[in-house]
Amino acid sequence: MSSVSASWLDEVKWDDKGLVTAIAQDAASGRVLMVAWMNRESLQLTADTGIAHYWSRSRRKLWKKGEESGHLQTVRELRLDCDGDVIVMQIEQIGGIACHTGRESCFYRRFENGGWTTVDAVLKDPRAIYHP
């Protein structure tokens, strides 16, 4: 998935903090697994390595998805939306867990009967993932 020239990065509409929204979608099922942020460096690293890299706004640092948990995201395809301000990545989620809560997806709550209902089970206790 290597990029030949970095000029393609100029087509992305970065926000005032130099970030763009990035959606990770399971390549096989189409399910949205997570939404995060990318800066130029993380998007370039993602294109060059084929492994999803993000920018952590809370930690203010580059973040290779799965660097602590082992739940890497292998990128199959990168797409830029019509406005140039959202990236969608078709990914293979190694280990089947994308969410830090130990679930397949960060979108595990569904709006039902006027409130949020948890509809996806925890696949692995986060304490076992991050503090074995």
UniProtKB/Swiss-Prot annotation:
It comes from the Bacteria. Its cofactor is Mg(2+); Zn(2+). It catalyses: 1-(5-phospho-beta-D-ribosyl)-5'-AMP + H2O = 1-(5-phospho-beta-D-ribosyl)-5-[(5-phospho-beta-D-ribosylamino)methylideneamino]imidazole-4-carboxamide. One of its GO terms (biological process) is L-histidine biosynthetic process. Zn(2+) binds at C82, C99, C106. It is an enzyme of class 3 (hydrolase). It is found in: Cytoplasm. Belongs to the PRA-CH family. HAMAP family: HisI. This is Phosphoribosyl-AMP cyclohydrolase. The lineage of its organism: Bacteria, Pseudomonadati, Pseudomonadota, Betaproteobacteria, Neisseriales.
